[in-house]
Amino acid sequence: MRKISRWLAVGSVIALVASACGGGDGDSGGSGTPADPDEPRITQVGEGEGEVSIISWAGYIERGDTDPAYDWVTPFEEETGCAVTNKTANTSDEMVALMQEGAGQYDLVTASGDASLRLVESETVQPLNLELIESYDTVDPNLQDAPWHTVDTDGDGTAEHYGVPYQWGYNVLLYNDAIFKGQAPTSWDVVFEEQTLPDGKSNKGRVQAYDGAIYIADAAVYLRAHDPDLGITDPYALNREQFDAALNLLRQQRELVGRYWHDAFVQIDDFGNGEAVASSSWPFQRNVLAAEDPDFKSSTPEEGVTGWADTTMMHSDAPHPNCAYMWLEWSLNEKLQGDLAAWFGTVPAVLSACQGNELLTDEGCETNGLGDFDQIEFWRTPQADCFDDDEATECVPYLEWVTQYVAVIGGR
């Protein structure tokens, strides 16, 4: 069995921390409902319940409200009769909290790798029956059996699948080129070190940082390049010395940050009105801003980047499992995959979507990082065992990442 149990005991505590910062059983309508929590709940998709509730990142579940060209919800509703309701979450911790507190309320969640295993180990999500998802074999082989959504929970030597890959991408350095005068920033130092920007003014108070605890890994990526004596190899497996160094860098950054962002649309407003000029960000914000003003651009700093590979997971007490399975299948259609990749600036989980999509264009996947998969430090939940079997190694677990980053943001 994959070793992820050493942080299981803190899962509910993390949910409480996240909720501080930031039902009933459903009738499946299908057949064969195993009692074993390690087995899929249904063996065939029955009649839809008329609705499905999804927790997602902003921009992931679009019905054309922001831009009529991007709508993959309305066609699903028309085809299945399942009305989609969407709750957006701003951090992985918020997603975990919503799912753990939302039994009987939510069906699905688009979980990143720093949330997915917490949801599995707390039995908040259920294993999926891939036989009910006919398009699963179209998923990129890099993602089909990825460790952030496949776990051998019953110890039989075969991993169960808990998620359907959705999209993947990486965190970019968003900047305003009107401030940088055509000199694209090549290092994360622009958000970590006080300096004079090309417009002749200090960066102090004009940069932002992500307010999720997983951002500590971004500091570790920066330190790996600039302080090699620390010996950082994995930004999610930090020993005490490495972790303390990352915290010290983040405390230094605290003096520069104008806002810790978690709401993508608030960050868009901050850049649009000039309050922010550089920050870690998602391609989504860049795309929305650049559509109005081409001065808003992004770069990939030389130190490297963190990123996410998101999978759609089903709540153990999903009230609408039939509609949920219908959405899981729908989520893999080429048009949705390509349109979403164009909208968010990500790479589709279904690689055939990279060709022939009018919005994405045939060059879109390469532009969004298709060739960089092996260079991205994908989000994972930090564990005390450092992801290995060596009892001599000990890393700082995620609970402490959460509590310490909250303290940094609070000025402590």
Task: Please give the residue ranges for each predicted region.
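Extracytoplasmic ligand-binding site segments that recognize negatively charged/polar headgroups
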Residues: S53-D67, T110-V266
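Conserved C-terminal helix/tail region of periplasmic/extracytoplasmic solute-binding proteins
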Residues: D269, I376-R412
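Early extracytoplasmic/lumenal segment of secretory-pathway proteins
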Residues: D36-L119
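A ligand-binding cleft/hinge motif common to bilobed small-molecule-binding domains
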Residues: A115-R118, S280-D295
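Mature extracytoplasmic/periplasmic domains
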Residues: T306, D310, M314-P382
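Periplasmic-binding protein-like
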Residues: T138, L249-Q253, D293-S316
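C-terminal motif of bacterial Sec signal peptides marking the signal peptidase cleavage site
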Residues: V17-A20
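Bacterial signal peptide processing site
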Residues: G22-D25
